[in-house]
Swiss-Prot record:
MF (Gene Ontology): DNA binding; DNA-binding transcription factor activity
InterPro entries, sorted: TBP (IPR000814), TBP_archaea (IPR033711), TBP_dom_sf (IPR012295)
Annotated keywords: DNA-binding, Repeat, Transcription, Transcription regulation
Family membership noted in the UniProt record: Belongs to the TBP family.
Gene (name only): tbp
Protein name: TATA-box-binding protein
One of the protein's GO biological processes: DNA-templated transcription initiation
Sequence repeats: 10-86, 101-179
Xref: PROSITE patterns: TFIID (PS00351)
Amino acid sequence: MQDPKETINIENVVASTGIGQELDLQSVAMDLEGADYDPEQFPGLVYRTQEPKSAALIFRSGKIVCTGAKSTDDVHESLRIVFDKLRDLEIQVDEDPEIVVQNIVTSADLGRNLNLNAIAIGLGLENIEYEPEQFPGLVYRLDDPDVVALLFGSGKLVITGGKEPDDAREAVDKIVSRLEELGLLDG
């Protein structure tokens, strides 16, 4: 059977940064080709990069959130493109603004079906939320790493809240060993 850690795939990386000054988004939107700005729908300007694929949400405060990237390297590359585009518009941007990863969303596959009712009881109700009438996944909150894992009956997992790519590997290890301890990964 394949090691579940080998199935881990980064689905989304969200990071934030800022340029330390307020922006006139209306004027930026007019000068920045491909920018979407509709303040009645959303307070930020949306600028999409194609290579790597991501979206930068640029706010009047100068704060920028990058979402949709598939790796932390892609986040840095996407934001470098955004910074360069802003500099092209004569907007002052520091040489190397701090970029903080806020959330890494990953998926993985345990490779077998899971009995979520048994898992809910085995893991203890203080660490989980499981209401199949509301949502088909079991929500499992881990402390170390500080992530939330969604477990589905198919054996698929979604791990959210990670700050480092290794957080997902660590979470999968802990989930697998905990389920094995409880005898809930057999067959």
